[in-house]
Regions:
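Alpha-helical elements of the RecA-like P-loop NTPase motor core of helicases
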Residues: 49, 67, 97-98
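Short, charged, surface-exposed secondary-structure boundary motifs
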Residues: 67-73
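Short active-site oxyanion
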Residues: 33-39, 56, 85, 109-110
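Glycine-rich loop at the start of a catalytic domain that most often binds anionic cofactors/ligands
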Residues: 52-54
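Catalytic cysteine-centered active loop of the rhodanese-like fold, especially the PTP/DSP P-loop
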Residues: 73-114
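Flexible, polar/low-complexity N-terminal or interdomain linker segments that lie immediately upstream
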Residues: 1-50
Length: 114
């Protein structure tokens, strides 16, 4: 049986981009040394090995995001307890848009993405 997908990834990303603030690279470069911002790298281990990451960024594989944010999860990471702005990023701004929207819906704030 063929599945009837009623909302594809493009629509989900569009909704996320309508909801969450998007920063451009130039804006982010000025924030890299600002301690009020935490950069969250959503790429997987292979991407990090191949391409590296922003110095000081926290690596959070996309598949673990909700578990690491939720304080009731046994996988919770304390980095998500801070009163800072969370800047999510990935390779194409797709995962980062979806992640920032999800994090916002979970109550993490403020959030944005590259």
């Amino acid at each position: 049986m063929v599945q009837n997908i009623v909302k594809g990834y493009k629509a989900l990303i569009h909704e996320a981009n309508e909801t969450v603030k998007t920063l451009n690279v130039e804006e982010c470069q000025s924030l890299l040394k600002n301690e009020d911002y935490i950069f969250i790298d959503l790429r997987d281990f292979r991407e990090l090995q191949r391409e590296g990451k922003i110095p000081g960024a926290f690596s959070c594989p996309r598949g673990m995001l909700e578990f690491w944010i939720d304080q009731e999860s046994p996988y919770h990471k304390a980095i998500f307890n801070q009163d800072k702005t969370y800047v999510f990023y990935c390779a194409s701004a797709w995962r980062s848009a979806l992640s920032a929207k999800t994090a916002s819906e979970m109550g993490l704030a403020p959030v944005c993405h590259i």
